[in-house]
Amino acid sequence: MRAPGAGTASVASLALLWFLGLPWTWSAAAAFCVYVGGGGWRFLRIVCKTARRDLFGLSVLIRVRLELRRHRRAGDTIPCIFQAVARRQPERLALVDASSGICWTFAQLDTYSNAVANLFRQLGFAPGDVVAVFLEGRPEFVGLWLGLAKAGVVAALLNVNLRREPLAFCLGTSAAKALIYGGEMAAAVAEVSEQLGKSLLKFCSGDLGPESILPDTQLLDPMLAEAPTTPLAQAPGKGMDDRLFYIYTSGTTGLPKAAIVVHSRYYRIAAFGHHSYSMRAADVLYDCLPLYHSAGNIMGVGQCVIYGLTVVLRKKFSASRFWDDCVKYNCTVVQYIGEICRYLLRQPVRDVEQRHRVRLAVGNGLRPAIWEEFTQRFGVPQIGEFYGATECNCSIANMDGKVGSCGFNSRILTHVYPIRLVKVNEDTMEPLRDSEGLCIPCQPGEPGLLVGQINQQDPLRRFDGYVSDSATNKKIAHSVFRKGDSAYLSGDVLVMDELGYMYFRDRSGDTFRWRGENVSTTEVEAVLSRLLGQTDVAVYGVAVPGVEGKAGMAAIADPHSQLDPNSMYQELQKVLASYARPIFLRLLPQVDTTGTFKIQKTRLQREGFDPRQTSDRLFFLDLKQGRYVPLDERVHARICAGDFSL
């Protein structure tokens, strides 16, 4: 019997015994016995262990909701909120560029963004128009999207790693009327210039040699220098539910999609991070993440824009300079994502690691296997791990430092934040349905797909989707919690324990079935990486002709050709089940990652274990010999012909 059922039964028994005329003490004792016997003691245990956590989480939820309500009623937008911050502390440092040493005060950021707003208004851009921004992370990046927002123009924030077809695709799908690019991106723009429409205006910001100037490009900086720096005389008439900018998905599973970020979503993400981890006005945040993604530009820069913190930017993460920057700029909060923490652990031990003032590291993707090693080596007291995607409505946060957890949902107040793990078909990753057509919720310990109930009138539960309607529709399921409702499908598999803590398992498609067992790519990657001294590893499943399921394949960074596959295999046998050990190995100079340090597997999966597709060293696990053997075209042909036992 579940706790609510046990509670109902105990109340009923109490009423019945009282009705029969027994003393109230007997009735109470009997009711308590019924409650405990029905499993209610588990509920009491959960309450005792999680009440403090849940009440703090509830206070954060209420605080963010009240702040959003106040701003909505006032007709505020993100630029309005920033301007209030700038008026309050004009001379405080807003942004610091660690690469160049350039510092911008709040007054300077406000002035620059005003110039951007006035210039594009003068050029005829109207509220709702789109301008693509394509430059590395530096103060100008923030000033550009903020200034465009002041004019009601939507910025499409392009990934600076995009080239050729993906770059042209993202520009095309954004419906941008203009492109602002940094001088450092001129070559990339030149590669796609013929694919871009002639009506697309181009502006270049930053250093650019005369030989690099494209024929149809205007130099932005001189134009901004001549533009008025006062606020626009007429506000664009936007609100918290209007579009602020587009952020593109990482593209780990195909071409990027443009996720819509409205003003209230920007506020919500930044505010949840601020209050969940008790950030302070005096904090200095170190942000070495890409500004074209939400972690760097909303969770990080949002602390500057909304709450007035100083944010130190570094356009590209550097493991060797990370702690030096933190010491130099007196940083108290740092951000991480993906594999950053592992890269830091690979660095030689230095004294500077212990001279910093960092009290909080906030981000996502810290593997449980290195969580405690990271905190102990670098002396960071608090880890603020969270789960969320730019567009999702089911973000969660680890607010009390539970090792390995990416967040929680209350087991007591389950309806306060309507998210759920639901059972899915392991092959198709489609939600399973019960006899009434509703999704089947998972019990504690059961992995399931994370979903969030959609309510477009609630800024904490709305789903704004993507520029592409078809992409938006693919992320929505109906009749999930109850008949006729709608829910956002995260695409991620998590598992929840009895206390409501959630643990990230896999992104949909990051498991494969082999020998009748489900293999988690993330778990195998963590084991291999640890065995190899935190080396970059990508694990994925590949189809073998005539064989059911997918065989495991591991791509391992081996730039100096020093890895001995069979020495590694001896260790693998001690720590991985036989079905989880990779059948194929690919040793390559480096493993491709996205701009947010997520492993890029699309090309690797497409090329599979075919030696004709790559010049990298390939190996095959010959089970009869019990060792990895080189995989050439002859061995490949024999595998495809079924000559080997797999």
Curated annotation (Swiss-Prot):
Q: Where is this region: Sufficient for oligomerization?
A: 191-475
Q: How is its activity regulated?
A: Inhibited by Triacsin C. Both insulin and muscle contraction stimulate translocation to the plasma membrane in muscle, increasing fatty acid transport activity.
Give GO terms for biological process.
adiponectin-activated signaling pathway; biotin import across plasma membrane; export across plasma membrane; fatty acid transport; glucose import in response to insulin stimulus; lipid transport across blood-brain barrier; long-chain fatty acid import across plasma membrane; long-chain fatty acid import into cell
Q: Reply yes or no: does the keyword Mitochondrion apply.
A: yes
EC number, UniProt record: 6.2.1.15, 6.2.1.3, 6.2.1.-
* Enzyme class, UniProt record, top EC level: ligase
According to its UniProt record, where is this protein located?
Cell membrane; Mitochondrion outer membrane; Endomembrane system; Cytoplasm
| Cross-referenced SUPFAM superfamilies | Acetyl-CoA synthetase-like
Catalysed reaction(s) here are: a fatty acid(in) = a fatty acid(out); (9Z)-octadecenoate(out) = (9Z)-octadecenoate(in); hexadecanoate(out) = hexadecanoate(in); (5Z,8Z,11Z,14Z)-eicosatetraenoate(out) = (5Z,8Z,11Z,14Z)-eicosatetraenoate(in)
| Signal peptide span | none
What tissues express this gene product? Higher expression in white adipose tissue than in heart. Highest expression in skeletal muscle, heart and fat. Lower levels in brain, kidney, lung, liver and testis. No expression in spleen or intestine.
Segments on the Cytoplasmic side according to the record's topology features? 35-646
Superkingdom of the source species: Eukaryota
Q: Which residues span the membrane?
A: 14-34
What's the impact of mutating residue 250 to A? Diminishes LCFA import and decreases nucleotide binding. No effect on localization to the cell membrane
- Membrane-related topology note: Single-pass membrane protein
How does inactivating the gene affect the organism?
A: Mice deficient for Slc27a1 are viable and do not display overt developmental phenotype or alteration in whole-body adiposity. However, they are protected from fat-induced accumulation of intramuscular fatty acyl-CoA and insulin resistance in skeletal muscle.
Picking any one GO molecular function of the record gives: nucleotide binding
Which amino acids does the record list as binding AMP? Answer: 246-257
Main location, first listed in the record: membrane
What exactly does this protein do?
Answer: Mediates the import of long-chain fatty acids (LCFA) into the cell by facilitating their transport at the plasma membrane. Also functions as an acyl-CoA ligase catalyzing the ATP-dependent formation of fatty acyl-CoA using LCFA and very-long-chain fatty acids (VLCFA) as substrates, which prevents fatty acid efflux from cells and might drive more fatty acid uptake. May act directly as a bona fide transporter, or alternatively, in a cytoplasmic or membrane-associated multimeric protein complex to trap and draw fatty acids towards accumulation.
**Subunit structure as annotated in this protein's UniProt entry:** Self-associates. May function as a homodimer. Interacts with EPRS1; mediates the translocation of SLC27A1 from the cytoplasm to the plasma membrane thereby increasing the uptake of long-chain fatty acids. Interacts with DGAT2 and this interaction is enhanced in the presence of ZFYVE1.
**Protein name, please?**
Long-chain fatty acid transport protein 1
Q: Which organism is it from?
A: Mus musculus
